[in-house]
Amino acid sequence: MPCYAYQGIVPVVDPTSYVHPLASLIGDVIVGPGCFIAPGASLRGDFGRIMVEGDSSIQDNVSVHANQLRDTVIRRGATIAHGSIIHGCEIGENSLIGMNAVILDNAVIGPENLVAALSLVKSDTHTPERSLVVGNPAEVVKTFDPHQVTWRNNGGGEYQKLARAALTDLIEAEPLTQADEDRQAQRVASEAIAVRLSGATAQERERKAAATNTI
């Protein structure tokens, strides 16, 4: 992975986390256990510290930057979806930041929040636990019941499994000139279901979450 010391401070990555070779870590960056850092992600700890707690997922082309006044903290089990910008703020435990969302300086996203795709969370915004945060500028539009938080990560989520698998199974290779006949059979089955707020997929996620919580 591209990893750069800055002013003598070297990034730290737990050996159980996977950082893709096309991601970059600069300076005061600390990545906890079981995390997945995807291609194109940039974590720049040149102005301040970036702390990524365990079981978090930083997806493709995410930019994470700290400012001089506070650390940027991504709490345990958080998911930062493709193309998002996380700048000088705190993302709560088990929160999901949707694709291309922007979280600005000194904002604090509460635990188990869902920030909708393309939302802009202004500086100094604080959101309560289990909030749905939507818009530009973003506002809290509802509060989820506990069983509706179907994106919660407890070490067994899809991206936590991917982090473990990628450490041994993700290998650079030359492309084939044609597809293998048994290509589909080689793929490991996944139970991942996209996060939706309504419709059949939302109902299925809630059903599975409710069943898990009653065990």
Indicate residue ranges for each PLM-predicted region.
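Small cofactor-carrier domains centered on a conserved lysine used for covalent cofactor attachment
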Residues: 38, 59
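Short Cys/His-rich Zn2+-coordinating modules
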Residues: 16-18, 37, 76, 97
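Glycine-rich hexapeptide-repeat left-handed beta-helix
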Residues: 1-8, 12, 46, 54, ...
